Amino acid sequence: MPPTFVLASASPARKRLLEMAGISPLVAVSHFDESSLAADNTVALVEALAKAKAGTVASKFADALVLGCDSLLLVNGQTYGKPESPAVAIARWQTMRGQVGELYTGHALIDRTQNRCLCQTGLTKVHFADVDDDTIQAYVGSGEPLQCAGAFALEGKGGMLINKLDGCSSNVIGLSLPILRSLLQRLGYSLKDFW
């Protein structure tokens, strides 16, 4: 019998991705203060945040697999997380439109039964449509982008504002299923163990 699979995230999109892939996670939100960490580059930061979230939750479980994730968007040398307000989301979209961004998602999988932690980061290039100000205002007014890294949700209305992706689409939603499969296999688990 495999250990309990715990998702250390409040993200409904991550939970939905896992469920669609056949994994029914227990959700335990870390409440980790993301502003307490800094790093030299985006990859190091998303991995550190994912590991901190997973570690905070893993300390509460004796026998579990705990997955922590964190996503950030890099556009023109600027790193973006969730926008703090509608005004910030509008300004970001005015900067991002017509540009290509790099969406990084850090994954940390802690296996409490083996006392091991594996980390890996996914990168997907996002080609943003050159949308007008009215579209930006309407999109931000919908409220959808306010809880998303980079101020867009690929799986929602934001998907209409993306021209193309280079890389893993689930990574953009906040959890790369191919990376999760790889991490599970490296820890000695089969996908069917969780179906």
UniProtKB/Swiss-Prot annotation:
Q: Which GO terms describe its cellular component?
A: cytoplasm
Which protein family is named in the record?
A: Belongs to the Maf family.
Alphabetical list of HAMAP family matching this protein: Maf
Determine the domain of life of the protein's source: Bacteria
Share an example GO biological-process annotation for this protein: nucleotide metabolic process
Mainly localized where? cytoplasm
List the catalytic residues. Answer: D70 (proton acceptor)
Where in the cell? Cytoplasm
Query: Which terms does the record give in the GO molecular function aspect?
Result: nucleoside triphosphate diphosphatase activity
Q: Briefly, what is this protein's role?
A: Nucleoside triphosphate pyrophosphatase. May have a dual role in cell division arrest and in preventing the incorporation of modified nucleotides into cellular nucleic acids.
Q: What class of enzyme is it?
A: hydrolase
> Which cofactors are reported in the record for this sequence?
a divalent metal cation
Name recorded for this polypeptide: Nucleoside triphosphate pyrophosphatase
The EC number(s) this enzyme carries? 3.6.1.9
> What InterPro entries does this protein's entry cite?
ITPase-like_fam (IPR029001), Maf-like (IPR003697)
**Does Hydrolase appear among the keywords?**
yes
Chemical reaction(s) catalysed = a ribonucleoside 5'-triphosphate + H2O = a ribonucleoside 5'-phosphate + diphosphate + H(+); a 2'-deoxyribonucleoside 5'-triphosphate + H2O = a 2'-deoxyribonucleoside 5'-phosphate + diphosphate + H(+)
- List keywords of the entry alphabetically: Cytoplasm, Hydrolase, Nucleotide metabolism
Q: Does the keyword 4Fe-4S apply?
A: no
